[in-house]
């Protein structure tokens, strides 16, 4: 990452923590009973299981196999599909929240078209839906 990208990411994390202070759980969790193909992801499964999450939203199908998640009653959801589902449930309210975010990103990167931004974020289906509105 470039220094600018790192700074943007750090600012985004700070903003997220300001907006959702309860989202980060420092609770110690014993990772030993949990297994995933990538040991670096086990802490995510452990926290989700211990806190009775219904789902883990991730693009990473390979390292979060549904068969393993089923053991804990957790579903893996693709972020693109999740945004489409949220759109079905909350339509204009969701779009009203996303428009300023997209405008900010586009002002920082005016050379990139909106659909390309959605594609780079691995959200192509939702991006097409958003672009049609």
How should these model regions be labeled?
Residues 16-20, 72-74:
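Short, mixed-charge aromatic SLiMs
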Residues 1-9:
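A short secondary-structure junction motif
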Residues 2, 30, 34, 84-87:
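Residues at structural and domain junctions
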Residues 9, 16, 43-44, 78:
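Catalytic cores of nucleotide-enabled group-transfer and carboxylate-activating enzymes in metabolic
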Residues 61-133:
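Acidic, PIN/NYN-like endoribonuclease modules and their adjacent C-terminal/linker elements
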Residues 12-15, 51:
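Short alpha-helical scaffold segments that flank and stabilize functional sites
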Residues 20-55, 105-116, 120-133:
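Active-site neighborhoods of divalent-metal-dependent phosphate/nucleic-acid chemistry enzymes
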């Amino acid at each position: 990452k470039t220094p600018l990208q790192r700074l943007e990411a750090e600012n985004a994390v700070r903003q997220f923590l300001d907006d959702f202070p309860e989202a980060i759980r420092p609770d110690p969790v014993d990772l030993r009973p949990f297994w995933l193909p990538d040991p670096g992801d086990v802490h995510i499964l452990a926290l989700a299981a211990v806190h009775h999450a219904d789902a883990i939203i991730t693009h990473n199908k390979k390292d979060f196999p549904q068969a393993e998640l089923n053991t804990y009653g957790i579903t893996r959801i693709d972020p693109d599909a999740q945004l489409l589902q949220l759109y079905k449930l909350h339509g204009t309210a969701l779009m009203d929240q996303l428009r300023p975010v997209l405008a900010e990103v586009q002002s920082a990167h005016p050379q990139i078209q909106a659909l390309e931004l959605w594609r780079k974020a691995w959200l192509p289906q939702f991006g097409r839906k958003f672009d049609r509105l």
